[in-house]
Amino acid sequence: QDRLVDQVQQTLRRRGYAGLDVDFEFLPGQLAAAYAAFLARLRRLLNSQGFFLWAALAPKTSARQAGLLYEGHDYAAVGAAVDGVLLMTYEWGYTAGPPMAVSPLPNVRTVLDYAVTEIPPEKIFLGLSNYGYDWPLPFVQGVTRAPSISNQRAIELAIEHDVAIQYDETAQAPFFHYTAADGTIHEVWFEDAR
């Protein structure tokens, strides 16, 4: 830890950064307290030099949420240890998962509803997706892989294939289907200004 802290401080000063956002993922639950203690130590050191410390948190919906992505992030402890948190409210639709919105609004709201019970609201910021995925169909779990695409590329694909962009009112996300030159049907979810 000491070497990491020293290197972080040197990098912040050398590059002229204002602070640091720590994004440690897949921490086992038994390390949750140690992780929060590390963040508290790092914050004290960084704040004393005029830097801020933030931490990115997996999108939890309860304190006891199971899973390696969630168990190492104690929202209350991390929220107390840092200057601010960035909730990773994206990746419900992802490369290896079934076609769906990257950041469905009901999921984002559920995470935020829980977060404000554990972390002061003024410390909470939402991570927003600015990309999409292009799934070849049919989706087969463990086999299908959807490449990520920019929102602009998604719009270009819809134009190239002369298909209408639809809008899922529940997820609050645009999507469309198109048929590739090889006959494969694709489903694309992305984000736009709506």
Which stretches of residues belong to each language-model region?
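Active-site glycine- and acidic-residue-rich loops that bind
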Residues: 61-69, 105-108, 134-136, 146-149
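Chitinase-like catalytic core of GlcNAc-active glycosidases
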Residues: 1-104
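Gly/Pro-rich active-site loop or hairpin
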Residues: 94-115, 172, 177-192
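Long, low-complexity, intrinsically disordered polar/charged segments
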Residues: 5-32, 120-125, 144, 148-149, ...
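Surface-exposed substrate-engagement region within the catalytic domains
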Residues: 73-79, 88, 118, 149-164
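Glycan-binding loop/region signatures in secreted carbohydrate-active enzymes
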Residues: 130-194
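Active-site region of glycoside hydrolase catalytic domains
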Residues: 44, 48, 84-87, 93, ...
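Short amphipathic alpha-helical segments and helix-helix/interface helices
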Residues: 39, 43, 75-76, 112-116, ...
